[in-house]
Amino acid sequence: MTHVILGHCCKDASCIQVCPQNCIRPTPAEPEFDTVEHLYIDPGACIDCSACVQACPAGAIRPDSALSGSERLYARRTRDFFADLPTARQRGPVRLGLPRAFPQADRPLRLAVVGAGAAAMYTVRELLQRSSSIRITVFEQQAEVGGLLRTAVSWNHQGIRDMVRLFDIPFSDDRVETRMNVRVGADVSIAALQREFDVVVLAFGASRSRAIGVPRIPGMHQAITLLSAANDAVRHGTQARLLRGPKALIVGGGNVALDVAAAIARRRIVTRAGEPIAQVAVVARSSVRRPSFTMSALHELTELDIDLTIARDGAPPDVGSADPVQRLFAELAEDRRPTVDTRKLPVTLWFGNEVTSLHSVGGRIRLETTAKRTFTADSVVNATGFASTAVAGVPFAEDGVVSNRRGRVVSPDTGASIDGLYVVGWAKRGAHGGVGDNRRCAAETVDRIVADIERIRSDPRRAATSAYGRGHAGGQG
């Protein structure tokens, strides 16, 4: 019997570290790691030791004999992956290496981490592993740690939601203090933190929706608001009565757009009158040949009680494609039969339609696209992606991320590094990648801090004792 990694794999790579057979691929050192949706266990090498099951923080690994009918897809994907992988690389050694520690110093290193989401958690954990005397203060504007992991991940992704428990050990360490309900940039400035700490790490994520059309148009909603409301509704056994019906239009083509469609299909998001939405259209800028969502997100949507249509504009399905999404498209086209089941929610995916205008007409919303199409709906959900909120004293690039080179914050004017200021997570690389991607991202940023720290601490301007560094208490406060 072998084990299979499912689609909600977080790519934390903890499983790779504990596997005695080195049979989990790709590793973080391999080029495919950045592009695969999830990791794979070689069915010809797995010895059923279950070490990976215990190590997986997302609960995404199961014995193949325990897979449900819909999960068998991942066993097939695993076989396909290793069939295409060169034999020489299937069982090669895994080179993880030991992280470089902070050099010894005459006083503890003081760091501020801005934000308390997944990127911050992995950063704090990485920092604690590099020094026994380090002192870390985490500043968070909300009342709880966890960020979008706590508020926006669907209840159907319970394995991912359970990753909140990873905060427990690092954030309760005696070397870590948390300061909740503090807005950096408003309650305390970046400049003040730079004066008080040796290093400031920006981990505030990207939770601001990218703008489309006219702001505050009646019937417009942000995806993050709806998903958070849906989670609250599930927690309280109710429904999120937010939309105008009967038709909803979701603008955006990533996993978040499909998450909103799934929440509507599950009737967690309904009309203000409590009625289910009767029709959903997802309007994506990406092409049907290169959609932005993952195969797992699409597969999850197809498992719901919906009637899914892929609007292809006459283009035939790519039957021979190696891309898993295109394969699923082809399977859906082959299996599709005319339906008269009015109980199923009609969901149509439109591709190649970038929004050019959006306005209110007669109480409804009209949307026009680059493909010369016009869509009309009662509610529109903006799921076009996220950007970081600007913070005074932090340089931002045009794409909405903090100006940086591999975690070192740089001046956009000169390109020079700003000593003592670093960034991690979505604020560093943009709003893409899952929870576990932050682990490698955090390690890269901390590597830069370790490399720079002696130069930073030799700066006489940073030699004063920090008010934040005195009387340092552990735990959440």
Describe each model-derived feature in a short phrase:
Residues 53-112, 122, 129, 155:
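Flanking helices and flexible, charged tails adjoining ferredoxin-like Fe-S electron-transfer domains
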Residues 183-200, 358-374:
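Conserved beta-strand-loop-beta-strand element in the redox core of flavoprotein oxidoreductases
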Residues 109-133, 257-266:
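N-terminal Rossmann-like FAD-binding beta1-loop-alpha1 element of flavoenzymes
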Residues 16, 33, 218-238, 242-244, ...:
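FAD-site-proximal beta/loop scaffold in flavoenzymes
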Residues 135-138, 145, 151-152, 160-163, ...:
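Dinucleotide-binding/catalytic capping subdomain of oxidoreductase cores
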Residues 408-477:
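C-terminal, flexible cofactor-proximal segment of oxidoreductases
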Residues 14-34, 38, 51-69:
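Iron-sulfur cluster-binding cysteine motifs and their immediate structural context
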Residues 75-102, 209-274, 398-414:
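Glycine-rich dinucleotide-binding loop and its adjacent helix/turn
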